[in-house]
């Protein structure tokens, strides 16, 4: 195994907070659509400065809903990184669009310098993938996406 991210340091720093949150959910007895979900949705929408935040069951559902909300479907292309998990690709295919892969940079993230060349008339979205505690260069990606 190649260790690229020491998640245990982060977990150790937040362990009590995580265990307390899980304990509260189980003590409440409502595992689905409970008060913790509502609290998360409110905080998420506030943090993102949007009207609504909707908790879903998994990444595939979240990306599929986002693509459908943007009317992305058959005949469209969505750019993402070649270094991604199956849910990213599954969501794009679920929406009816085609996947266009862009290679990675030295940090294993989408190579921003290659995105522009991948764009064509069918391109409707770019889905960056943040990995190993690293963020993609979202400012650069958003600047490309706005064009």
For each feature predicted by the language model, list its residue ranges:
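N-terminal "arm"/small-domain region of PLP-dependent enzymes with the aminotransferase-like
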Residues: 1-30, 35
């Amino acid at each position: 195994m190649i260790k690229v991210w020491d998640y245990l340091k982060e977990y150790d720093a937040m362990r009590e907070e995580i265990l307390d949150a899980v304990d509260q959910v189980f003590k409440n007895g409502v595992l689905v659509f409970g008060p913790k979900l509502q609290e998360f949705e409110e905080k998420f929408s506030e943090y993102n400065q949007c009207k609504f935040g909707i908790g879903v069951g998994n990444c595939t559902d979240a990306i599929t809903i986002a693509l459908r909300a943007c009317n992305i479907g058959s005949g469209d292309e969505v750019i993402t990184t070649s270094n991604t998990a199956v849910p990213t690709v599954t969501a794009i295919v679920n929406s009816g669009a085609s996947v266009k892969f862009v290679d990675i940079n030295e940090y294993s993230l989408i190579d921003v310098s290659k995105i522009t060349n991948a764009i064509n008339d069918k391109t409707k979205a770019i889905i960056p993938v943040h990995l190993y505690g690293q963020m993609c260069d979202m400012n650069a990606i958003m600047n490309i996406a706005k064009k």
